[in-house]
């Protein structure tokens, strides 16, 4: 009797949780439908939100979303307007070119995207 109960429980578990080879569930697919696992860098660790490329292909660049940490070549801009007050902005976004804020104000918005390189 115990074996029968265990067998039924095993079959029920297999039906409730499909095998990995069947692919992710529809709910999982919906939640991650915009995530590109083939992105150049993927989820790295260079900055907030994990940094080195949250689907960089979305921004047409190998580096993608670098995070909010200023990069060495950007500090001349990031620190000119009263210190690190742009931490809630996309100042350090780097697509195929880069983000500078030479002409930026203090509003929290995308600033001066330069697609030609920095």
UniProtKB/Swiss-Prot annotation:
It is found in: Secreted. Keywords: Neurotoxin, Secreted, Signal, Toxin. It comes from Gemmula speciosa (Splendid gem-turris). This is Turripeptide NCR-01. The keyword Secreted applies. Residues 85-102 have a biased composition (Polar residues). Residues 1-16 form the signal peptide. Residues 63-118 are annotated as: Disordered. GO terms for cellular component: extracellular region. The mature peptide contains only 1 cysteine. GO terms for molecular function: toxin activity. Expressed by the venom duct.
